[in-house]
């Protein structure tokens, strides 16, 4: 089952007696919203995810759908450049990047996941064509063919 992020105070962390733990520990950042960027070598799709209220904590993945808002997000050219540079340095040709826009108006990198969730973007923004981009990339690598039909991959 899914276990989302948990807020731990520094003192609690110091008191733990666990020798090894499969976890990632990051400082808590007060956020305005989250940014998710699905990045192929030659293309990307991105969104901004914001809470409609503060009632559900800090992980939108466990909120009821009506409690968050998904909007298009236009990253800067420099941000896309840096993401591509990271993909190249990790020898990846695809990755899903997560960022937080802090209340201090700084953008904070959280992670890049080579198998991250991004297909939901098409549910909110069909014009993003992430299914099309993914299928083209899987079939053609960098040689994107706009004529490949997504329809032939749907099961009735």
Predicted regions and their residues:
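Short loop/turn microsegments at loop-to-beta-strand junctions
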Residues: 34-35, 95-97
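Phosphate-binding site of ATP-dependent enzymes
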Residues: 1-74
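Homeobox/homeodomain signature
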Residues: 15-19, 84, 97
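Anionic group-transfer/hydrolysis microenvironments
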Residues: 28-29, 38, 98-100, 113-115
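C-terminal active-site "lid" helix and adjoining low-complexity regulatory extension at the edge
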Residues: 69, 73-77, 81, 85-92, ...
């Amino acid at each position: 089952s899914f276990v989302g992020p948990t807020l731990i105070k520094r003192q609690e962390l110091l008191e733990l007696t666990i020798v090894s733990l499969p976890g990632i520990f990051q400082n808590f950042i007060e956020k305005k919203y989250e940014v998710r960027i699905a990045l192929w070598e030659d293309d990307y799709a991105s969104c901004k995810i914001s809470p409609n209220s503060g009632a559900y904590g800090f992980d939108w993945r466990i909120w009821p759908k009506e409690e968050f808002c998904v909007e298009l997000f236009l990253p800067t050219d420099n941000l896309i450049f840096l993401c591509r540079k990271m993909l190249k340095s990790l020898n990846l040709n695809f990755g899903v990047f997560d960022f937080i826009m802090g209340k201090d108006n700084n953008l904070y990198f959280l992670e890049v996941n080579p198998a991250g969730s991004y297909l939901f973007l098409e549910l909110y923004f069909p014009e993003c064509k992430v299914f099309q981009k993914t299928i083209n990339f899987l079939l053609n690598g960098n040689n994107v063919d706009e004529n490949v039909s997504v329809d032939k991959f749907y099961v009735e």
